[in-house]
Each structure stands twice: as C-alpha cells, then as structure tokens.
Design a protein with these regions (language model features):
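Conserved nucleotide- and phosphate/pyrophosphate-binding catalytic cores
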Residues: 203-406
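Positively charged, low-complexity intrinsically disordered leader regions
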Residues: 1-32
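Divalent-metal (Mg2+/Mn2+/Ca2+)-assisted nucleotide/phosphate chemistry catalytic cores
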Residues: 10, 89-90, 96-215, 221
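Buried hydrophobic packing segments
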Residues: 50-57, 177, 195-203, 296, ...
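Short acidic, glycine/serine/threonine-rich loops at helix termini
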Residues: 76-80, 127-133, 225-231
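N-terminal catalytic cores of NTP/NDP-binding nucleotidyl/phosphoryl-transfer enzymes
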Residues: 21-78, 186-193
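A charged helix-plus-loop insertion that forms the helical arch/lid used to bind
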Residues: 78-94
Length: 406
C-alpha cells in the first residue's frame, strides 16, 4: 500500500489540487508546510490531525515545514468564524511559538535538516506595503476573494480590511517558501481550501511553476462537531493545562460511534488491526477506547505517563482501590479560606469543576457532587483546613474525579 492509499484508507484526504501530489508524496519528493496560528501557548487535541499527518509524511521521506503564524496571528484568520479573533503582541507570539516547538518535537524529527520550523514574521513583518500591493495584490481578484467560503460567514456581520488581507498574506507565505525553501506543497484543514488555492495560483502567475495543495478531513464527532474540547474547554497538549490523566480520559470517553474513526485517523496502529477492531461491539468498544486513549497519551506524554493514566482510570472506574496519586488535583492556600474553611461552591470553581457558583449550585442541588464518596447534601456544605490537609476527593457526575488539598 502506498502512502497516499494509506491516507485515503484512514479517511484523511479531503481535496487535492492535482494528481501529481500522489507521486510526490509516495516518492518522498514533497517539501510541504502546515501553518499554525499561535493564538495560545500550547497546541491542542484539535492539532492532532496536522501533527500526525506531518509525522506520517516525514516517515515516508517527505520534508515537513511547521510554519508558525507570527505574522498572520497578528491579523486573525476569519475562516469558520463569525467574530474577529483577538490580536496578539510580538512578545505573546514569540512565547507561544517557543512552546509550540517543544511540543511538535514529540511528533517531528527536526535533526539534520529533516524538518524546519519557520516563523512567518521573519519575512512578513518586513514587507513594504506598496511593493506588496503592486507585486502581489495585482494577482488577486477582489470579486473572486469575496466569493471565497472563508469570508462568507463574516460578510453579514462585517469583514474588516485587516482580515480581508489574510488570504493574500497566507498566499504570500507559500510563494516565499516556494522560492527560498523549495516548498512545493501545502496541507491544511478543509476550511482553508480557498486560502490554499490563492497560494498555488500566486506561484503560477508570478513564477510560472506548479505548486500543490491538499486539505485533510476535519476531526468531527458523529454529530458533526469539532473534537478536541471538553465542557467547552480545549484539551491541551501541555500537561500543566490538561493533565495526562485528563487527556487520557478525554479520549477514553469518546462516543461509541466515534472511537474507531479516531483510531483510524489519529493512531499509527496497522490498518489490518484497525479493520479487525472495527467488528468489535458492546463491551469490546470500551477496550477500543482504552487503546485509543493509551496510544494518543503515549504519543503526547510518553509511555510512562500513559501507563499511569490508564492505571488510575482503571482504579477509579473499575472498582479497585482509588488511585489518588495520578488524579487531577488542586492545591489551595490559606488565602483561599474564609475563617478557616471554604464552601463547596467556591471550592468547585477554584478546582475548575464549575465555571461559576451558580453552575456549582445546580450540580449540587441535582445530586451530582460527592466528597470522599458521600453525596453533598446542600450547597452550604464547607470544608475545614484540617479536612483539606488530608485531601478531599470531589466526584462530579459519573466520571470526573478531582483531589483538593491544602
């Protein structure tokens, strides 16, 4: 099976500009890039598709370029949004880019020029605006740009000129890397198709040469919602933002209808094994979820952390003695207490188990909160410093455990 056939079998290919892409990636002749807007100081589970694709392509001899959006992050990509993204400072972007590289190195081999990490800001921030308008802007039709899918949702609410430039700037990135780094291919999410076509067309018009683009399938659940968030919050690759246990549990709790799709698209398990697993039903789906969670946690946090997370999850949910050592936890200080105690509602908010006192109150009233195995009887319950020094295990719903200490 060729690389392209495997990508298709895993359901990763959405669209390609030309069939020449197939020969290029199969023969390890592609120098390709994927862009990352560094709007936070950590990658998320939503970046998994891009990271694993880069790894697959590199393993076949192709050269990845991880392009950090140091310039375009200052604008904000309007694709798939109805609001304007927050713009970041140069200092924010530099910090976020450094965090990204550390996480990407778990997927991509940057040694011996096998891969590159570039920052758009290195060329984009030094552009002369008049020259850009003359040399690049002249190659774009405003009529065609306004028909692009990435601008549709923003037109009714108002599309700023700042955001309107995003397609031109992303196209220029491809054009620049084609000239200076031999980058002949771009990969991205299916929502980036219009922007990617802009880059291939700019290269054709300015240089008379061919460049290629392929979009990858967005990772969505059976309801069509993007995966990578839990309770509205991102699932981070940074263990300080999302612990290895929480990361493991996110994938362990995917829906029955989604587990095999995730295994096929995100893991490196052989397709023959995945095809056999696709016949599993009922309780064996839980086994498949454990495999998914272990594989992805191991990829991000290492095998040791994956094994700890798996053992903790089995202890918590399998009826064995509770493993509190690897449980998500929050350590309070004396300053968090009032007159030597803290109420359950405040405690839940500080532990990230509820977004507000109101939400915490509803959970308690509905009987969905336990402390050390005992149901919280009323929202007025509080915990003393002595109790907290021993550690209090809060259970929210059926699957969320959190240890709070002082």
């Amino acid at each position: 099976m060729t690389l392209y056939e495997e990508l298709q079998a895993r359901g990763l290919v959405a669209q390609i500009t030309d069939n020449e892409i197939i020969d290029l990636i199969n023969n390890g002749k592609a120098t390709f890039y994927i862009g990352f807007d560094c709007t936070a100081d950590s990658l998320t589970a939503g970046h998994f598709m891009a990271l694993t694709l880069m790894k697959r392509l590199q393993m076949a001899g192709n050269k990845p370029i991880a392009l950090i959006g140091g310039g375009t992050t200052m604008i904000g990509d309007p694709s798939g949004r109805t609001d304007m993204r927050k713009m970041l400072t140069k200092e924010d972007i530099a910090h976020n880019a450094a965090c990204f590289k550390k996480q990407m190195e778990k997927f991509i081999d940057f040694s011996d020029d096998k891969a590159l990490m570039l920052n758009i800001a290195d060329w984009l921030l030094n552009l002369n605006y008049v020259e850009l308008l003359r040399d690049v802007g002249a190659c774009f039709s405003v009529n065609n740009m306004l028909r692009a899918k990435c601008y549709e949702q923003r037109m009714e609410r108002g599309l700023s000129f700042l955001e309107f430039n995003y397609m031109i700037m992303q196209s220029y990135d491809f054009y620049y890397m084609f000239q200076h780094y031999g980058c002949n291919m771009q990969f991205g999410g299916d929502d980036q198709w219009s922007n990617m076509l802009g880059g291939t067309e700019l290269i054709r018009r300015k240089l008379g040469k061919d460049a290629y683009a392929m979009t990858i399938t967005l990772l969505t659940d059976s309801q069509g919602k993007k995966m990578g968030k839990t309770a509205g919050n991102a699932v981070w690759l940074d263990p300080n933002k999302t612990s290895p246990f929480e990361f493991y549990q996110y994938w362990r709790n995917v829906g029955d209808a989604d587990v095999m799709k995730c295994i096929r698209m995100l893991t490196f398990l052989p397709l023959e094994q995945i095809d056999e697993m696709s016949t599993w039903k009922d309780q064996r789906l839980n086994e498949a979820k454990e495999i998914l969670a272990y594989e992805l946690t191991s990829m991000v946090h290492g095998k040791e952390e994956a094994e700890k997370a798996q053992a903790a999850a089995r202890a918590l949910f399998g009826g064995a003695a509770m493993d509190t050592e690897h449980m998500p936890s929050t350590q309070l200080t004396e300053a968090d207490l009032t007159d030597g105690s803290i109420g359950i509602l405040t405690l839940m908010v500080k532990a990230g188990l509820a977004a507000s006192n109101g939400e915490a109150r509803r959970l308690v009233v509905q009987g969905g909160v336990l402390a050390d195995g005992e149901k919280i009887a009323a929202p007025t319950v509080s915990f003393t410093a002595e109790q907290l020094k021993k550690g209090v295990v809060i259970k929210k719903g059926k699957k969320v455990y959190h240890k709070v200490t002082l």
